[in-house]
Swiss-Prot record:
SMART domains assigned to the protein according to its UniProt record, in alphabetical order: PHB
Family statement: Belongs to the prohibitin family.
Protein name (database record): Prohibitin-2
Originating organism: Pongo abelii (Sumatran orangutan)
Pfam families recorded: Band_7 (PF01145)
Amino acid sequence: MAQNLKDLAGRLPAGPRGMGTALKLLLGAGAVAYGVRESVFTVEGGHRAIFFNRIGGVQQDTILAEGLHFRIPWFQYPIIYDIRARPRKISSPTGSKDLQMVNISLRVLSRPNAQELPSMYQRLGLDYEERVLPSIVNEVLKSVVAKFNASQLITQRAQVSLLIRRELTERAKDFSLILDDVAITELSFSREYTAAVEAKQVAQQEAQRAQFLVEKAKQEQRQKIVQAEGEAEAAKMLGEALSKNPGYIKLRKIRAAQNISKTIATSQNRIYPTADNLVLNLQDESFTRGSDSLIKGKK
């Protein structure tokens, strides 16, 4: 810039009169360039701007969207807000309904309400997040968590999260903030309470295991009783059958011999069984008498 001015000064006509004219031209051009530069500004994507003038303060009816805009230099200057949602993690220790200490952390996705930027600037300025979010999050967390016992905070986590989100969203509206998402990222208790919960769970598991073993023993006992009753009934029926017809035992021997014969017939080894191998005592006269009586009984 300085070099360009030197070159321009070298080309000016000599003499006091020419020097004065050139100087006026330079000053006029510089003033015009400065005025144009100060009269134009750009609002980037995801931003909004409001005007502050030195006489009336913040202009409540002017909210500028993205793009190129004009202003009156010195008299007006823009205040630009980023209206994109930004995440913030906030942790707060609080107490449950049964007086247990709870460490809870929230991830809050917030953005300013673009339609209320002038009033937000008057109340909170540009650092609205630092002024508002930590205080209202702590307030809502203490209010909601105090409604639940420590165990309910675990078993009803979805309900707790929904209640926190609803109350926090309504509270943020008072400060021209919009909350796009509120989620519980961490929920922990004191070491003493955690140890007590773990001990309780172990005791419950042991009790359930003992109950299972008792039920299993009872079931096995019932099964043995049923089996013994069945065997006793079978023995009783067999005794009655033998007392009524002695040939019944001979028939059982014949059927056993048939089963043995079938097994031997399908075997690869060649075996020639005898009557003794087939559990048949054919030389016993009682066998013949019992068989005859069984046949006559059927007739």
